[in-house]
Amino acid sequence: CDVIEADGGTRCAAVSGGYLALHLALKRAVDAGTLKALPLDDSVAAISVGVVGGMPVVDLEYQEDCVADVDMNVVMTGNGRFIEVQATAESEPFERSVLDELLRLAGEGIAQIKAEQMGIITRTYAGGRGGA
C-alpha cells in the first residue's frame, strides 16, 4: 500500500490501508465467485504513540516524532490482540506506567481506525462483512 501524503506515521498508515485494500480486493473476489468465502478472521490496524514534552501523544506528526522522548508503533487486530509493539526510548529510559498508558491510548486509536475501516467497507459493499 503506497502512502500518497503523510506528515508522519507512514508505516502505520500503510498497515491500516493495506488491510483495507486487501479486504476490499478479497470481497470483490468473493462477489465474482473466485473465492467461496472471505478468508479473513479479523481486521488489522496500526498507530503511532509516544511521549512528547512529557505528554502522551497519539498519531504523532512528523514534528512530534522528531522530538519525541518515547516513540512507539503498535499493530493490533480488531479484537485487540497485538501483532507488533515496537518502542524506543529516544533519550532516557521510561517507566512501565508510561508503556501501559501508551498501549491503552494505542488501543483506543486503533479502535477508531477500525471503525473507519469498517465504515468504508460497509459503504463500498452494502451488507458487507463488517467483522473482519
Predicted segments — roles?
Residues C1-A132:
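Polyanion-binding surfaces on beta-sheet-dominated domains and ring/shell assemblies
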